[in-house]
Amino acid sequence: MEIKEKIREILVNTIEGLNGKSLKYDEQLITTGYIDSYEIIQLMEVFENEFFVKIDIEKISLSNFETIDAMSTLILEMKGESHE
């Protein structure tokens, strides 16, 4: 499963209010109120366990969790992979 699809699946299964929603990769999730700082912490834990990464504290920013695209880039960076 592609990383973006896996992130979408995690979001829909983890975040209340996203259940059953069809999310676009560039859909703004913080700006629209779907996720907040509490959910970001929740997602960090899930991502670290699911993708076997450690998210650096300095990488915790709203922009890194705003969209599925941004989350995918963050995870790939933490894995040491290119996000091209």
Which residues make up each language-model segment?
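Phosphopantetheine-dependent thiolation modules in NRPS/PKS and related acyl-activating systems
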Residues: 2-44, 49-84
